Amino acid sequence: MRIRPWTPLSEQGSVGRPSFVADHELWDDDRLAAADRVEAELAHVDLVRLVFGDPHGLARSKTLTADAFRAVLRNGMNFSPGPFLFDTGHAVAVDFLGDDPGVGVDELVGAGNFVAVPDPLTFQILPDRAPRTAWVLADEYLRDGTPHPLSSRGVLRRVLAEYESRGLAPAVGLEVEWYLTRRLDDEPGNTGNGFGLQGQAPRVAAMNAGYQFNLDAQYDTIAPLTDPLALRLLELGLPLRSMEHESGPGQVETTFSPMTALDAADAMLLFRTVTKQFCAARGHHASFMSHPALDSADPSGWHLNQSVIERATGRNLFEAEGPSGSMSPEGKAYADSLLDWARDLFMLSVPTVNGYRRLAAHHTLAPTRIGWRVEDRSAMLRIVGTGAGAHIENRVGEPCANPYLNIAAQLFAGLQGLAGGAAGDAPAPGELLVPQSLRQSLEAFRAGRAAQLLGTPLTACLTKLKESEVSRYETWCAQNSSRPDRTTQWEQREYFGAY
């Protein structure tokens, strides 16, 4: 068979912006060295997924050929800003076609491109993929080379720079609950969907009856999926610690050993993405939606464990002498500051309408009050461990939260306490309850101090995204009858498939 010899022009000027990384000095020495190693690895790769986390914590990507990625590695790749502008249901929440999108980013006018620059330290070849595929995370930049003000990963990197300047390094551990279900059909869910309206949620069946917490026999019913998934996660280098069966039917908890904060956020994005892909390829559906509309579902949470290490000595700042659960003065200052900032930043830990169902009083193991206690799972902050293992577990998060923003919010708030920042007034008794709806949380976010962490543009953008989401939900509720104690059809369509 004769094959026409197509003659491509140079890729160097056809993707991204030539010499973008070098011209703007975007990489440190570690990344420059890693980029050379990545170029060598491309000989063993067919395709590369260039990925960034959107404001909702979902992985957005372009799949490039290995040859194209050689240029992208140092030029960056042009991306549409759409993922910054759509809410969870793909409704346009930021008016990018008007003269002023209203978030303070001029480059959004007309939906102009931004530049996604691969972080060569995150490059890895995915196991058992044909064609041979690599995954690499990107940092987002404006076209003039400045960090994109709507970048979630950029927010976390700024917070970590503050810790580094003080000789400190946060350590973060992940405990993530999610649902494993069996798909009943292969319908794509495109009936009646569009901008601002998600299609039908996946039709699924439960894996077991549930409600035998940690029962070994129940784990056996999910082990044909979770055991090979565990091996896949280990092949990816993730520091997996355990797979456990929780209370709900097919409800899984996956835990990881402590990591650096940026590694933890990157790991969470990769873990959720790979888990959904792995299960889908085997006729199952994994969902990180907190409270899916499944018979007898128990809501899922994301417990975020955190401590702070002094770089020079390796000392855990939270460590104190005394009985189990005691905390050092630094640890108490960190915890108190988390409480002081809790309402302002709560929406970053529980960002969906559905996530607040878990925080209702009748879910006894979910936190309902803003407070901290030693070894008490009803509190927002649970103080755990002693000595070098002393840490704070924040129990309010939902599993689908944006990992960069959730982790950044915790570390930023805690740092204000470590730095001796003035705390706000103690909450009045009626304010000790955690927010009970996304609307409540959004109003606290809108009126609060979030811009000190996020900057004005991202604060404005998230406000628009969440206002669009909650308004669509409220409109649906006004037009449809539903029980307030039940997950609605709107929530199931909005979150169960995508998350």
Region roles according to the model:
Residues R2-L240, L433-Y499:
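ATP/Mg2+-dependent ligation/transfer catalytic cores
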Residues A171-Y179, L197-D216, L236-F256, A286-S307, ...:
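Core alpha/beta catalytic barrel or barrel-like domain that forms the active/cofactor pocket
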Residues D23-E25, L32-E41, D46-E164, L168, ...:
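Active-site capping/gating regions of soluble enzymes
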